[in-house]
């Protein structure tokens, strides 16, 4: 089907078949459609609402045109934590931090991601701030996943065909089907994922699309307080694909041994603040409460010794960050089939944080990417 004909159908609020959507996406991704046609199509599709058939067809085209990352060895526990972003919460990079915790717990993590579009900091922004070189070839990314347990798949490096849609997307400045496609077009071909989405209505369609695309274990989530993550301050809707069946349920922090609490202190302004909080959370959980407070009280500010109240507030912030990371990492560990339940996954995540291995994985990936580029120069 030609894009003009598809556009007419969408204007009449008619759904496209998987085959029709495949035809149109091929035209968009191979430069056969004009910017005006692309923009009109994306807006008309958004206004009608994307169906499972349309998401599936579009994802198949993006996957077929992606530059692959061929991970060798046992892929039983290969998982991704990439979400849609765009929830507007301003929180630190939770899913990226969770990726390193899952790797420390034994998963192989192919973390797909990009720079920030609407949030304070994207996964690529955070990792670049942490010293990770984003400009490594696909075979090097595969080696990082194999040897370290985690690698970063920088979306622009693997989805070059997206260049044809970048202009219209930026000029329109609204969410389109491409915001949904990113998490379901991982170049490493993962079949196990945790996907946070910006709108609860997307949970079921994305899960069903992934079922058609051959995924094995997937958790698509959106919290009742609007996060594209598991939340500490409200129940989270989970649409889970496992063993060919899809189930829906809600999870509260107490269900997995955590505490419900405010997350206002977990908002950041940029990647520097996000990285600092993540490092503190992953490092602090190797300490107990008393030791952590004792160490912080050795510091001074302009008015003298830091107060107990300030120390307690700082500890509470780091503790909340650690719990939020453990919640989401636990889901990744469960999706990777390293735990029998989400609650068990959270326990394994807490162990990985407490051991210091999660923070070590972050440093290891940064060192690996830079040593690799030095060897090639």
Q: Which residues does each predicted region cover?
A:
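N-terminal glycine-rich anion-binding loops that anchor highly charged ligand groups
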Residues: 1-2, 10-56, 63-73, 324
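Glycine-rich anion-binding loops and their surrounding alpha/beta cores
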Residues: 9, 64-67, 91, 106, ...
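Short, glycine-rich nucleotide/cofactor-binding loops
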Residues: 13, 31, 83-90, 283
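Short amphipathic alpha-helical face segments that pack within enzyme cores
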Residues: 40, 97-101, 324, 328-331
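Active-site cofactor/substrate anionic-group-binding motifs, chiefly glycine-
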Residues: 49-111
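Acidic, glycine-rich active-site loops and adjacent beta-strand->loop/helix elements
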Residues: 83-88, 113-119, 158, 224-225, ...
């Amino acid at each position: 089907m030609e894009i003009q004909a598809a556009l007419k159908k969408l204007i009449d609020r008619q759904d496209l078949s998987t085959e029709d959507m495949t035809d149109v996406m091929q035209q968009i991704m191979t430069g056969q459609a004009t910017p005006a046609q692309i923009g009109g199509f994306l807006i008309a599709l958004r206004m009608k609402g994307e169906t499972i058939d349309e998401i599936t067809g579009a994802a198949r085209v993006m996957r077929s045109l992606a530059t692959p990352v061929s991970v060798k060895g046992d892929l039983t526990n290969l998982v991704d934590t990439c979400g849609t972003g765009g929830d507007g919460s301003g929180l630190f990079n939770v899913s990226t931090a969770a990726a390193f915790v899952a790797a420390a717990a034994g998963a192989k993590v192919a973390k797909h991601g990009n720079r920030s579009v609407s949030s304070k900091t994207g996964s690529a922004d955070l990792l670049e701030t942490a010293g990770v070189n984003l400009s490594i070839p696909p075979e090097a990314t595969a080696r990082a996943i194999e040897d370290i347990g985690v690698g970063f798949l920088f979306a622009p490096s693997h989805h070059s065909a997206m260049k044809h849609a970048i202009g219209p997307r930026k000029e329109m400045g609204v969410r389109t089907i491409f915001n949904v496609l990113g998490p379901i077009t991982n170049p490493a071909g993962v079949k196990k994922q945790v996907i946070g989405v910006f709108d609860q209505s997307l949970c079921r369609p994305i899960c069903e699309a992934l079922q058609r695309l051959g995924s094995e274990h997937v958790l698509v989530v959106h919290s009742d307080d609007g996060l594209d993550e598991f939340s500490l301050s409200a129940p989270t809707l989970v649409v889970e694909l496992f063993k060919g069946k899809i189930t829906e349920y809600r999870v509260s922090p107490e269900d997995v041994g955590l505490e419900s609490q405010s997350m206002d202190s977990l908002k950041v302004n940029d990647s520097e603040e996000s990285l600092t909080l993540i490092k503190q959370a992953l490092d602090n959980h190797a300490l107990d409460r008393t030791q952590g407070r004792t160490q912080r009280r050795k510091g001074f500010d302009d008015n003298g010794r830091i107060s107990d109240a300030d120390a307690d507030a700082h500890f509470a912030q780091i503790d909340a960050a650690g719990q939020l990371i453990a919640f989401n990492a636990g889901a990744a560990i469960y999706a990777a089939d390293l735990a029998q339940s989400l609650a068990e996954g959270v326990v394994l995540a807490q162990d990985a944080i407490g051991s210091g291995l999660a923070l070590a994985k972050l440093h290891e990936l940064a060192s690996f990417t830079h040593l690799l580029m030095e060897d090639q120069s």
